[in-house]
Regions:
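Basic, glycine-/proline-tolerant helical and adjacent loop/strand elements
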Residues: 189, 193-382
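Domain-exit/linker segments immediately C-terminal to small folded modules
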Residues: 301-483
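Long, contiguous all-alpha helical interaction modules
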Residues: 1-208, 406, 410-617
Protein backbone atom coordinates (compact mmCIF):
# COMPACT_ATOMS: atom_id res chain seq x y z
CA UNK A 1 0.00 0.00 0.00
CA UNK A 2 1.30 3.44 -0.88
CA UNK A 3 1.52 6.01 1.89
CA UNK A 4 2.06 9.75 1.64
CA UNK A 5 3.77 11.82 4.33
CA UNK A 6 3.32 15.59 4.12
CA UNK A 7 5.46 18.30 5.70
CA UNK A 8 4.03 19.28 9.07
CA UNK A 9 5.31 20.87 12.29
CA UNK A 10 9.07 21.24 12.80
CA UNK A 11 9.53 18.09 14.90
CA UNK A 12 7.61 15.98 12.36
CA UNK A 13 9.70 17.49 9.56
CA UNK A 14 12.88 16.60 11.43
CA UNK A 15 11.60 13.02 11.47
CA UNK A 16 11.11 13.15 7.69
CA UNK A 17 14.70 14.40 7.28
CA UNK A 18 15.93 11.61 9.55
CA UNK A 19 13.92 8.98 7.66
CA UNK A 20 15.40 10.11 4.32
CA UNK A 21 18.94 10.24 5.76
CA UNK A 22 18.65 6.66 7.04
CA UNK A 23 17.45 5.45 3.64
CA UNK A 24 20.20 7.35 1.84
CA UNK A 25 22.88 6.00 4.19
CA UNK A 26 21.73 2.45 3.43
CA UNK A 27 21.59 3.09 -0.35
CA UNK A 28 17.89 2.27 -0.57
CA UNK A 29 16.13 5.49 -1.53
CA UNK A 30 12.71 3.92 -2.06
CA UNK A 31 10.88 7.08 -0.91
CA UNK A 32 9.94 9.47 -3.71
CA UNK A 33 10.55 13.10 -2.79
CA UNK A 34 7.83 15.44 -4.08
CA UNK A 35 7.32 19.17 -3.53
CA UNK A 36 5.85 19.10 -0.01
CA UNK A 37 5.59 15.37 0.72
CA UNK A 38 7.29 12.00 0.37
CA UNK A 39 5.61 8.80 -0.77
CA UNK A 40 6.51 5.11 -0.77
CA UNK A 41 5.14 1.58 -0.71
CA UNK A 42 4.87 0.48 2.92
CA UNK A 43 6.07 -3.07 2.16
CA UNK A 44 9.48 -1.51 1.42
CA UNK A 45 9.87 -0.94 5.17
CA UNK A 46 10.56 -4.62 5.91
CA UNK A 47 14.30 -4.00 6.40
CA UNK A 48 14.04 -0.51 7.87
CA UNK A 49 14.79 -1.70 11.42
CA UNK A 50 18.16 -3.00 10.14
CA UNK A 51 18.80 0.29 8.32
CA UNK A 52 18.02 2.19 11.53
CA UNK A 53 20.44 0.15 13.63
CA UNK A 54 23.19 0.34 11.00
CA UNK A 55 22.85 4.13 10.73
CA UNK A 56 23.27 4.70 14.47
CA UNK A 57 25.84 1.92 14.89
CA UNK A 58 28.11 3.54 12.31
CA UNK A 59 27.49 7.01 13.74
CA UNK A 60 28.50 6.01 17.28
CA UNK A 61 30.90 3.12 16.51
CA UNK A 62 32.67 2.74 19.89
CA UNK A 63 35.29 0.27 18.63
CA UNK A 64 36.36 2.56 15.79
CA UNK A 65 36.30 5.71 17.93
CA UNK A 66 38.33 4.05 20.69
CA UNK A 67 40.82 2.64 18.17
CA UNK A 68 41.39 6.11 16.67
CA UNK A 69 41.91 7.69 20.10
CA UNK A 70 44.30 4.94 21.22
CA UNK A 71 46.35 5.10 18.01
CA UNK A 72 46.61 8.88 18.20
CA UNK A 73 47.64 8.76 21.86
CA UNK A 74 50.22 5.98 21.37
CA UNK A 75 51.68 7.94 18.46
CA UNK A 76 52.28 10.86 20.83
CA UNK A 77 53.87 8.52 23.38
CA UNK A 78 56.24 7.16 20.71
CA UNK A 79 57.20 10.72 19.71
CA UNK A 80 57.98 11.60 23.33
CA UNK A 81 60.13 8.48 23.71
CA UNK A 82 62.04 9.19 20.49
CA UNK A 83 62.82 12.79 21.41
CA UNK A 84 66.60 13.02 21.88
CA UNK A 85 66.89 16.47 23.41
CA UNK A 86 69.73 17.01 25.91
CA UNK A 87 68.23 20.07 27.57
CA UNK A 88 67.32 19.22 31.17
CA UNK A 89 64.25 21.47 31.19
CA UNK A 90 63.00 19.92 27.95
CA UNK A 91 63.65 16.39 29.26
CA UNK A 92 61.60 17.16 32.37
CA UNK A 93 58.79 18.60 30.25
CA UNK A 94 58.80 15.53 27.98
CA UNK A 95 58.59 13.22 31.00
CA UNK A 96 55.60 15.17 32.32
CA UNK A 97 53.90 15.04 28.92
CA UNK A 98 54.60 11.31 28.67
CA UNK A 99 53.04 10.73 32.09
CA UNK A 100 49.97 12.80 31.15
CA UNK A 101 49.51 10.99 27.83
CA UNK A 102 49.80 7.55 29.44
CA UNK A 103 47.14 8.52 31.97
CA UNK A 104 44.92 9.81 29.15
CA UNK A 105 45.13 6.60 27.09
CA UNK A 106 44.62 4.46 30.20
CA UNK A 107 41.45 6.40 31.02
CA UNK A 108 40.13 5.75 27.50
CA UNK A 109 40.77 2.02 27.81
CA UNK A 110 39.52 1.81 31.42
CA UNK A 111 36.21 3.38 30.43
CA UNK A 112 35.51 0.49 28.03
CA UNK A 113 37.10 -2.14 30.29
CA UNK A 114 34.55 -1.49 33.04
CA UNK A 115 31.72 -2.16 30.57
CA UNK A 116 33.32 -5.25 28.97
CA UNK A 117 33.84 -6.82 32.39
CA UNK A 118 30.06 -7.22 32.77
CA UNK A 119 29.62 -9.55 29.80
CA UNK A 120 32.91 -11.04 28.53
CA UNK A 121 35.53 -12.26 31.03
CA UNK A 122 37.98 -13.52 28.39
CA UNK A 123 38.10 -10.24 26.45
CA UNK A 124 38.27 -8.29 29.70
CA UNK A 125 41.31 -10.31 30.87
CA UNK A 126 43.09 -9.97 27.50
CA UNK A 127 42.71 -6.18 27.49
CA UNK A 128 43.54 -5.85 31.20
CA UNK A 129 46.85 -7.71 30.74
CA UNK A 130 47.94 -5.20 28.06
CA UNK A 131 46.50 -2.25 29.98
CA UNK A 132 48.75 -3.06 32.97
CA UNK A 133 51.85 -2.88 30.77
CA UNK A 134 51.35 0.78 29.79
CA UNK A 135 52.96 2.24 32.94
CA UNK A 136 56.09 0.15 32.31
CA UNK A 137 56.77 1.99 29.03
CA UNK A 138 59.65 4.37 29.74
CA UNK A 139 62.26 4.36 26.93
CA UNK A 140 62.40 4.23 23.15
CA UNK A 141 63.36 0.55 23.41
CA UNK A 142 59.73 -0.02 24.43
CA UNK A 143 58.32 1.15 21.07
CA UNK A 144 57.78 -2.41 19.79
CA UNK A 145 55.98 -3.22 23.02
CA UNK A 146 53.73 -0.19 22.50
CA UNK A 147 52.76 -1.40 19.04
CA UNK A 148 51.98 -4.84 20.45
CA UNK A 149 49.81 -3.39 23.25
CA UNK A 150 47.98 -1.16 20.77
CA UNK A 151 47.33 -4.03 18.35
CA UNK A 152 45.94 -6.39 21.02
CA UNK A 153 43.69 -3.81 22.70
CA UNK A 154 42.22 -2.36 19.50
CA UNK A 155 41.65 -5.85 18.08
CA UNK A 156 39.82 -7.00 21.23
CA UNK A 157 37.62 -3.88 21.46
CA UNK A 158 36.69 -4.17 17.78
CA UNK A 159 35.51 -7.77 18.09
CA UNK A 160 32.04 -7.89 16.56
CA UNK A 161 30.37 -9.23 19.72
CA UNK A 162 32.07 -6.61 21.92
CA UNK A 163 31.77 -3.60 19.64
CA UNK A 164 28.11 -4.27 18.86
CA UNK A 165 27.20 -4.35 22.53
CA UNK A 166 29.28 -1.28 23.45
CA UNK A 167 27.95 0.78 20.54
CA UNK A 168 24.35 -0.37 20.92
CA UNK A 169 24.32 0.58 24.59
CA UNK A 170 25.82 3.98 23.76
CA UNK A 171 23.33 4.99 21.09
CA UNK A 172 20.44 3.52 23.10
CA UNK A 173 21.49 5.73 26.02
CA UNK A 174 21.58 8.83 23.77
CA UNK A 175 18.18 8.12 22.18
CA UNK A 176 16.63 7.31 25.55
CA UNK A 177 18.02 10.33 27.40
CA UNK A 178 17.38 12.97 24.73
CA UNK A 179 14.38 11.75 22.74
CA UNK A 180 12.23 8.79 23.82
CA UNK A 181 12.79 7.60 27.37
CA UNK A 182 12.53 3.90 28.27
CA UNK A 183 10.37 2.58 25.42
CA UNK A 184 10.71 -0.51 23.23
CA UNK A 185 14.30 -1.80 22.94
CA UNK A 186 15.56 1.41 24.62
CA UNK A 187 14.40 0.06 27.97
CA UNK A 188 17.40 -0.92 30.08
CA UNK A 189 15.91 -4.35 30.78
CA UNK A 190 16.57 -5.18 27.10
CA UNK A 191 20.33 -4.56 27.45
CA UNK A 192 21.03 -8.25 27.98
CA UNK A 193 19.60 -9.11 24.55
CA UNK A 194 21.82 -9.39 21.48
CA UNK A 195 22.10 -6.73 18.78
CA UNK A 196 19.92 -8.80 16.42
CA UNK A 197 17.30 -9.53 19.10
CA UNK A 198 16.90 -5.82 19.78
CA UNK A 199 16.59 -5.16 16.04
CA UNK A 200 13.62 -7.56 16.04
CA UNK A 201 12.02 -5.69 18.94
CA UNK A 202 12.17 -2.49 16.90
CA UNK A 203 10.59 -4.30 13.93
CA UNK A 204 7.74 -5.56 16.10
CA UNK A 205 7.14 -2.21 17.84
CA UNK A 206 7.59 0.23 14.95
CA UNK A 207 7.28 -1.54 11.60
CA UNK A 208 5.20 -4.72 11.82
CA UNK A 209 1.89 -2.85 12.25
CA UNK A 210 2.55 -0.84 9.08
CA UNK A 211 3.25 -4.04 7.14
CA UNK A 212 0.18 -5.76 8.59
CA UNK A 213 -2.06 -2.84 7.59
CA UNK A 214 -1.23 -3.82 3.99
CA UNK A 215 -2.53 -7.32 4.67
CA UNK A 216 -5.65 -6.03 6.45
CA UNK A 217 -6.33 -3.65 3.56
CA UNK A 218 -6.03 -6.58 1.14
CA UNK A 219 -8.74 -8.39 3.15
CA UNK A 220 -11.00 -5.37 2.65
CA UNK A 221 -10.35 -5.50 -1.10
CA UNK A 222 -11.35 -9.19 -1.35
CA UNK A 223 -7.89 -10.48 -2.19
CA UNK A 224 -8.32 -13.63 -0.06
CA UNK A 225 -11.01 -16.24 0.34
CA UNK A 226 -11.94 -17.47 3.81
CA UNK A 227 -9.86 -20.67 3.40
CA UNK A 228 -6.76 -18.69 2.39
CA UNK A 229 -7.33 -16.21 5.17
CA UNK A 230 -7.50 -18.98 7.74
CA UNK A 231 -4.07 -20.33 6.71
CA UNK A 232 -2.43 -16.90 6.48
CA UNK A 233 -3.68 -15.72 9.88
CA UNK A 234 -2.61 -18.98 11.53
CA UNK A 235 0.90 -18.57 10.04
CA UNK A 236 1.13 -14.99 11.28
CA UNK A 237 0.04 -15.95 14.80
CA UNK A 238 2.53 -18.82 14.87
CA UNK A 239 5.33 -16.60 13.57
CA UNK A 240 5.09 -14.14 16.49
CA UNK A 241 6.74 -11.28 14.54
CA UNK A 242 3.74 -9.06 15.04
CA UNK A 243 2.72 -6.68 17.82
CA UNK A 244 0.33 -7.49 20.66
CA UNK A 245 -2.34 -5.27 19.08
CA UNK A 246 -2.24 -7.16 15.81
CA UNK A 247 -2.14 -10.54 17.60
CA UNK A 248 -5.38 -9.51 19.30
CA UNK A 249 -6.95 -8.46 15.98
CA UNK A 250 -6.01 -11.70 14.21
CA UNK A 251 -7.10 -13.80 17.21
CA UNK A 252 -10.50 -12.08 17.14
CA UNK A 253 -10.88 -12.68 13.40
CA UNK A 254 -9.91 -16.32 13.85
CA UNK A 255 -12.10 -17.12 16.86
CA UNK A 256 -15.11 -14.86 16.26
CA UNK A 257 -15.44 -15.24 12.52
CA UNK A 258 -13.35 -17.95 10.81
CA UNK A 259 -13.89 -20.67 13.45
CA UNK A 260 -17.60 -19.84 13.54
CA UNK A 261 -17.77 -19.96 9.73
CA UNK A 262 -18.96 -16.38 9.37
CA UNK A 263 -18.77 -14.53 6.06
CA UNK A 264 -15.98 -12.38 4.66
CA UNK A 265 -18.33 -9.38 4.70
CA UNK A 266 -18.72 -9.76 8.47
CA UNK A 267 -14.92 -9.81 8.86
CA UNK A 268 -14.65 -6.65 6.74
CA UNK A 269 -17.36 -4.97 8.81
CA UNK A 270 -15.43 -5.82 12.00
CA UNK A 271 -12.23 -4.33 10.55
CA UNK A 272 -13.95 -1.10 9.46
CA UNK A 273 -15.65 -0.56 12.81
CA UNK A 274 -13.17 -1.93 15.32
CA UNK A 275 -9.69 -1.99 13.79
CA UNK A 276 -9.12 1.15 11.74
CA UNK A 277 -8.90 4.49 13.54
CA UNK A 278 -8.23 8.12 12.67
CA UNK A 279 -4.69 9.56 13.08
CA UNK A 280 -4.77 13.09 14.53
CA UNK A 281 -1.30 13.85 13.21
CA UNK A 282 -1.52 12.95 9.50
CA UNK A 283 -5.34 12.60 9.19
CA UNK A 284 -5.06 9.00 7.93
CA UNK A 285 -8.29 7.05 8.52
CA UNK A 286 -6.94 3.60 7.66
CA UNK A 287 -4.51 2.98 10.47
CA UNK A 288 -3.81 1.36 13.80
CA UNK A 289 -3.23 4.05 16.40
CA UNK A 290 -1.61 4.56 19.78
CA UNK A 291 -1.78 7.57 22.08
CA UNK A 292 0.87 10.28 21.55
CA UNK A 293 2.98 10.59 24.70
CA UNK A 294 6.52 11.26 25.94
CA UNK A 295 7.69 7.99 24.38
CA UNK A 296 7.12 9.58 20.96
CA UNK A 297 9.24 12.68 21.58
CA UNK A 298 10.21 13.80 25.11
CA UNK A 299 10.69 17.57 24.45
CA UNK A 300 7.10 18.01 23.21
CA UNK A 301 5.07 15.49 25.18
CA UNK A 302 4.08 14.44 28.67
CA UNK A 303 3.20 11.15 30.29
CA UNK A 304 -0.48 11.40 29.30
CA UNK A 305 -1.74 8.63 31.58
CA UNK A 306 -0.15 10.23 34.64
CA UNK A 307 -1.12 13.83 33.86
CA UNK A 308 -4.79 13.70 32.87
CA UNK A 309 -5.55 16.62 35.20
CA UNK A 310 -3.68 18.87 32.78
CA UNK A 311 -6.12 18.08 29.93
CA UNK A 312 -9.60 19.41 29.26
CA UNK A 313 -12.15 17.04 30.78
CA UNK A 314 -9.18 14.78 31.57
CA UNK A 315 -9.18 13.69 27.94
CA UNK A 316 -5.50 12.95 27.22
CA UNK A 317 -6.20 11.03 24.01
CA UNK A 318 -4.29 12.06 20.89
CA UNK A 319 -4.13 8.98 18.61
CA UNK A 320 -1.33 8.74 16.06
CA UNK A 321 -0.78 6.06 13.43
CA UNK A 322 2.21 3.74 13.17
CA UNK A 323 3.65 5.59 10.17
CA UNK A 324 3.75 8.83 12.19
CA UNK A 325 5.16 6.88 15.14
CA UNK A 326 7.99 5.60 12.91
CA UNK A 327 8.66 9.06 11.46
CA UNK A 328 8.93 10.53 14.97
CA UNK A 329 11.32 7.71 15.90
CA UNK A 330 13.61 8.98 13.11
CA UNK A 331 13.93 12.46 14.68
CA UNK A 332 17.43 11.78 16.13
CA UNK A 333 18.74 11.16 12.61
CA UNK A 334 17.23 14.45 11.40
CA UNK A 335 18.65 16.61 14.19
CA UNK A 336 22.12 18.17 14.05
CA UNK A 337 24.35 18.27 17.10
CA UNK A 338 25.59 21.84 17.44
CA UNK A 339 28.54 22.83 19.62
CA UNK A 340 28.18 26.24 21.18
CA UNK A 341 30.46 28.30 23.37
CA UNK A 342 28.58 29.86 26.26
CA UNK A 343 29.64 32.47 28.79
CA UNK A 344 29.11 31.62 32.44
CA UNK A 345 29.85 33.60 35.57
CA UNK A 346 31.85 31.41 37.96
CA UNK A 347 32.87 33.10 41.23
CA UNK A 348 32.83 36.51 39.56
CA UNK A 349 34.92 35.30 36.62
CA UNK A 350 33.61 35.00 33.04
CA UNK A 351 34.25 31.43 31.90
CA UNK A 352 33.73 30.17 28.34
CA UNK A 353 32.37 26.64 28.20
CA UNK A 354 31.52 24.44 25.25
CA UNK A 355 28.30 22.46 25.20
CA UNK A 356 26.31 20.47 22.66
CA UNK A 357 22.70 21.26 21.84
CA UNK A 358 20.30 19.79 19.30
CA UNK A 359 19.50 22.00 16.32
CA UNK A 360 17.05 21.90 13.41
CA UNK A 361 16.13 24.36 10.67
CA UNK A 362 12.49 24.19 9.61
CA UNK A 363 12.03 25.39 6.03
CA UNK A 364 8.69 24.15 4.78
CA UNK A 365 8.84 25.46 1.21
CA UNK A 366 9.76 21.97 -0.06
CA UNK A 367 11.11 18.64 1.17
CA UNK A 368 14.19 19.03 -1.02
CA UNK A 369 15.03 22.47 0.41
CA UNK A 370 14.40 21.22 3.95
CA UNK A 371 16.76 18.28 3.43
CA UNK A 372 19.50 20.37 1.78
CA UNK A 373 19.37 23.04 4.46
CA UNK A 374 19.66 20.60 7.35
CA UNK A 375 22.39 18.61 5.61
CA UNK A 376 24.34 21.87 5.30
CA UNK A 377 23.71 22.63 8.99
CA UNK A 378 24.96 19.16 9.90
CA UNK A 379 28.18 19.69 7.92
CA UNK A 380 28.90 23.18 9.28
CA UNK A 381 28.14 22.15 12.87
CA UNK A 382 31.19 19.86 12.77
CA UNK A 383 33.51 22.87 12.41
CA UNK A 384 35.05 24.52 15.50
CA UNK A 385 32.11 26.50 16.85
CA UNK A 386 34.16 28.44 19.36
CA UNK A 387 34.63 30.77 16.40
CA UNK A 388 31.70 30.21 14.06
CA UNK A 389 27.99 29.67 14.61
CA UNK A 390 26.44 27.21 12.12
CA UNK A 391 23.10 29.05 11.97
CA UNK A 392 24.70 32.28 10.80
CA UNK A 393 26.88 30.38 8.36
CA UNK A 394 23.80 28.60 7.03
CA UNK A 395 21.92 31.83 6.32
CA UNK A 396 25.02 33.42 4.80
CA UNK A 397 25.29 30.43 2.47
CA UNK A 398 21.63 30.73 1.44
CA UNK A 399 21.95 34.43 0.70
CA UNK A 400 25.22 34.05 -1.23
CA UNK A 401 24.11 31.01 -3.26
CA UNK A 402 20.54 32.00 -4.14
CA UNK A 403 20.66 35.24 -6.11
CA UNK A 404 16.86 35.35 -6.71
CA UNK A 405 15.95 34.79 -3.07
CA UNK A 406 12.61 36.24 -2.01
CA UNK A 407 11.90 37.83 1.38
CA UNK A 408 9.15 35.33 2.21
CA UNK A 409 11.62 32.47 1.75
CA UNK A 410 13.87 33.84 4.49
CA UNK A 411 10.90 34.67 6.73
CA UNK A 412 9.90 31.01 6.40
CA UNK A 413 13.15 29.84 8.03
CA UNK A 414 12.43 28.72 11.57
CA UNK A 415 15.33 27.62 13.76
CA UNK A 416 14.85 25.32 16.74
CA UNK A 417 17.38 24.52 19.43
CA UNK A 418 16.66 22.14 22.29
CA UNK A 419 18.22 20.29 25.21
CA UNK A 420 16.48 17.46 27.01
CA UNK A 421 17.20 14.93 29.69
CA UNK A 422 14.65 12.21 30.39
CA UNK A 423 12.87 12.74 33.75
CA UNK A 424 14.96 15.87 34.40
CA UNK A 425 14.37 18.88 32.13
CA UNK A 426 13.46 20.08 28.65
CA UNK A 427 14.49 23.40 27.09
CA UNK A 428 13.42 24.51 23.62
CA UNK A 429 14.31 27.83 21.95
CA UNK A 430 12.86 29.08 18.68
CA UNK A 431 13.77 32.04 16.50
CA UNK A 432 12.95 33.16 13.01
CA UNK A 433 14.09 35.96 10.69
CA UNK A 434 12.13 39.18 11.11
CA UNK A 435 10.70 40.90 8.04
CA UNK A 436 13.14 43.84 8.01
CA UNK A 437 16.11 41.47 8.44
CA UNK A 438 14.83 39.30 5.57
CA UNK A 439 14.56 42.44 3.42
CA UNK A 440 18.14 43.36 4.32
CA UNK A 441 19.49 39.94 3.32
CA UNK A 442 17.56 39.90 0.04
CA UNK A 443 18.08 43.48 -1.13
CA UNK A 444 21.15 44.88 0.60
CA UNK A 445 23.49 42.11 1.77
CA UNK A 446 25.16 41.62 -1.63
CA UNK A 447 26.75 45.09 -1.51
CA UNK A 448 27.46 45.15 2.21
CA UNK A 449 27.81 41.89 4.14
CA UNK A 450 29.03 39.83 1.18
CA UNK A 451 31.92 42.18 0.34
CA UNK A 452 33.44 41.87 3.82
CA UNK A 453 36.57 39.72 3.63
CA UNK A 454 37.11 39.22 7.35
CA UNK A 455 35.00 36.09 7.84
CA UNK A 456 35.10 36.08 11.63
CA UNK A 457 33.94 39.69 11.75
CA UNK A 458 31.19 38.87 9.25
CA UNK A 459 29.95 35.97 11.40
CA UNK A 460 29.97 38.17 14.51
CA UNK A 461 27.86 40.75 12.68
CA UNK A 462 25.49 37.98 11.54
CA UNK A 463 25.15 36.82 15.15
CA UNK A 464 24.22 40.33 16.29
CA UNK A 465 21.74 40.78 13.42
CA UNK A 466 19.92 37.50 14.10
CA UNK A 467 19.80 38.15 17.85
CA UNK A 468 18.53 41.69 17.23
CA UNK A 469 21.49 43.30 19.01
CA UNK A 470 22.80 46.77 18.21
CA UNK A 471 25.89 46.56 15.98
CA UNK A 472 27.37 49.72 17.52
CA UNK A 473 28.93 47.66 20.33
CA UNK A 474 30.77 45.28 18.05
CA UNK A 475 31.87 48.13 15.73
CA UNK A 476 33.26 50.18 18.61
CA UNK A 477 35.08 47.15 19.99
CA UNK A 478 36.51 46.27 16.56
CA UNK A 479 37.81 49.80 15.94
CA UNK A 480 39.63 49.67 19.29
CA UNK A 481 41.17 46.34 18.28
CA UNK A 482 42.38 47.88 15.02
CA UNK A 483 44.22 50.63 16.88
CA UNK A 484 46.39 48.04 18.62
CA UNK A 485 47.45 46.45 15.31
CA UNK A 486 50.52 47.36 13.35
CA UNK A 487 48.52 47.52 10.11
CA UNK A 488 45.17 49.14 10.76
CA UNK A 489 42.10 48.41 8.66
CA UNK A 490 38.87 50.35 9.03
CA UNK A 491 37.04 49.44 5.83
CA UNK A 492 35.24 46.41 7.32
CA UNK A 493 33.97 48.57 10.19
CA UNK A 494 32.73 51.16 7.70
CA UNK A 495 30.73 48.41 5.95
CA UNK A 496 29.42 47.29 9.36
CA UNK A 497 28.32 50.88 10.04
CA UNK A 498 26.47 50.96 6.72
CA UNK A 499 24.77 47.65 7.62
CA UNK A 500 23.66 49.12 10.95
CA UNK A 501 22.26 52.22 9.25
CA UNK A 502 20.32 50.13 6.70
CA UNK A 503 18.85 47.89 9.41
CA UNK A 504 17.77 50.89 11.49
CA UNK A 505 16.05 52.43 8.46
CA UNK A 506 14.39 49.17 7.41
CA UNK A 507 12.84 48.80 10.87
CA UNK A 508 10.73 51.90 10.08
CA UNK A 509 9.21 50.17 6.99
CA UNK A 510 8.91 53.47 5.09
CA UNK A 511 7.57 53.30 1.49
CA UNK A 512 10.49 55.45 0.23
CA UNK A 513 13.07 53.45 2.12
CA UNK A 514 15.30 52.55 -0.84
CA UNK A 515 15.86 56.23 -1.65
CA UNK A 516 16.59 57.07 1.99
CA UNK A 517 19.08 54.19 2.27
CA UNK A 518 20.85 55.34 -0.89
CA UNK A 519 20.97 58.97 0.26
CA UNK A 520 22.30 58.18 3.75
CA UNK A 521 24.79 55.61 2.49
CA UNK A 522 26.24 58.38 0.34
CA UNK A 523 26.63 60.62 3.39
CA UNK A 524 28.44 57.86 5.31
CA UNK A 525 30.74 57.37 2.33
CA UNK A 526 31.60 61.09 2.39
CA UNK A 527 32.47 60.81 6.10
CA UNK A 528 34.56 57.68 5.52
CA UNK A 529 36.45 59.25 2.60
CA UNK A 530 37.00 62.44 4.60
CA UNK A 531 38.63 60.33 7.31
CA UNK A 532 40.83 58.58 4.71
CA UNK A 533 41.84 61.99 3.28
CA UNK A 534 42.82 63.35 6.72
CA UNK A 535 44.78 60.15 7.41
CA UNK A 536 46.76 60.60 4.18
CA UNK A 537 47.50 64.29 4.80
CA UNK A 538 48.74 63.65 8.34
CA UNK A 539 50.81 60.76 7.05
CA UNK A 540 52.38 62.99 4.40
CA UNK A 541 53.30 65.51 7.12
CA UNK A 542 54.61 62.63 9.31
CA UNK A 543 52.05 63.58 11.95
CA UNK A 544 49.99 60.37 11.73
CA UNK A 545 51.23 59.41 15.21
CA UNK A 546 48.53 61.77 16.55
CA UNK A 547 45.76 59.62 15.06
CA UNK A 548 45.60 57.00 17.81
CA UNK A 549 45.04 59.62 20.50
CA UNK A 550 42.33 61.36 18.50
CA UNK A 551 40.64 58.05 17.67
CA UNK A 552 40.54 56.75 21.25
CA UNK A 553 38.98 60.01 22.45
CA UNK A 554 36.31 59.88 19.73
CA UNK A 555 35.53 56.20 20.42
CA UNK A 556 35.09 57.01 24.11
CA UNK A 557 32.80 59.93 23.31
CA UNK A 558 30.69 57.71 21.00
CA UNK A 559 30.44 55.03 23.68
CA UNK A 560 29.26 57.59 26.25
CA UNK A 561 27.04 59.45 23.74
CA UNK A 562 28.97 62.71 24.23
CA UNK A 563 28.52 64.61 20.92
CA UNK A 564 30.19 67.77 22.23
CA UNK A 565 33.42 65.96 23.10
CA UNK A 566 33.38 64.20 19.71
CA UNK A 567 32.99 67.49 17.81
CA UNK A 568 35.75 69.09 19.95
CA UNK A 569 38.17 66.41 18.68
CA UNK A 570 36.95 66.85 15.08
CA UNK A 571 37.51 70.62 15.34
CA UNK A 572 40.97 70.09 16.86
CA UNK A 573 41.96 67.76 13.99
CA UNK A 574 40.84 70.29 11.37
CA UNK A 575 42.56 73.21 13.16
CA UNK A 576 45.85 71.29 13.43
CA UNK A 577 45.73 70.87 9.64
CA UNK A 578 44.78 74.50 9.03
CA UNK A 579 41.42 73.55 7.55
CA UNK A 580 37.84 74.71 7.95
CA UNK A 581 35.41 72.23 9.50
CA UNK A 582 33.84 70.14 6.76
CA UNK A 583 30.15 71.11 6.32
CA UNK A 584 29.23 67.40 6.18
CA UNK A 585 29.45 67.26 9.99
CA UNK A 586 26.92 70.07 10.43
CA UNK A 587 24.62 68.46 7.88
CA UNK A 588 24.67 64.92 9.28
CA UNK A 589 24.36 66.02 12.91
CA UNK A 590 20.98 67.54 12.01
CA UNK A 591 19.85 64.52 9.95
CA UNK A 592 17.10 62.50 11.66
CA UNK A 593 17.98 59.28 9.78
CA UNK A 594 21.63 59.27 10.80
CA UNK A 595 22.42 58.60 14.42
CA UNK A 596 25.54 59.77 16.25
CA UNK A 597 27.13 56.28 16.29
CA UNK A 598 26.86 55.84 12.51
CA UNK A 599 28.39 59.26 11.88
CA UNK A 600 31.26 58.74 14.31
CA UNK A 601 32.08 55.16 13.33
CA UNK A 602 32.13 56.00 9.60
CA UNK A 603 34.54 58.90 10.12
CA UNK A 604 36.81 56.88 12.45
CA UNK A 605 36.81 53.90 10.04
CA UNK A 606 38.23 56.21 7.39
CA UNK A 607 40.59 57.92 9.81
CA UNK A 608 42.42 54.66 10.60
CA UNK A 609 42.49 53.58 6.94
CA UNK A 610 44.45 54.63 3.88
CA UNK A 611 43.38 55.25 0.30
CA UNK A 612 44.70 51.87 -0.89
CA UNK A 613 42.85 49.85 1.71
CA UNK A 614 39.52 49.56 -0.07
CA UNK A 615 41.27 48.48 -3.24
CA UNK A 616 43.20 45.84 -1.28
CA UNK A 617 39.99 44.58 0.26
Amino acid sequence: MKTTIYLNDWFYNSGIVGFLRILDYNNDNFAEIKENYITFETNKLKNFHKYYFKYFFDKYNVGLRTKEKIEKSFEKIVNFLNDETLDNKEIKKIQENLKTEKKYVKDIIKKQLDKIKKYDDVTYTNILNEYNKIDKIKTKEDVDEINHIKEIITKEIQKDSINKRLTLNLFKSILSKNYFGQISFLNVVKNALTFEEQEKIMYKDYISNIIEIDFIDEILHDKYKIEELKILIKDKLDNQEISKEVIQIYTNIQKRFIDKEKSLDEIKDYIQKNVFAHCYMCENDKSLTSNYSEGNFIPLAVSSDNMKNFFWNQNAEFPICDVCKLILFCIPAGISSVKKTTKENVNGQVVHREKEVNGFVNYDTSVDDLLKMNNYLSQTSKVDKSIYNPYEELILNIVEQQKNLQEWQLENIFIVEFETEYLAFSRIEYFNIKRYIAKFFVEYSQNTLNIMKDYRYKIQIMDYILKNKDLKYIINSRLREELSKETQNGFNSFIATRIRLILNLLKKEDMEMDERVKKNNAKLSVLYNLGVSIHEELKAKKEDNKLDGYTYKMLNSIKSGNKKEFMDVVIRIHMSMGKDISPIFLEVMQDTDLDFESIGHSFISGLISNKFEKKDE
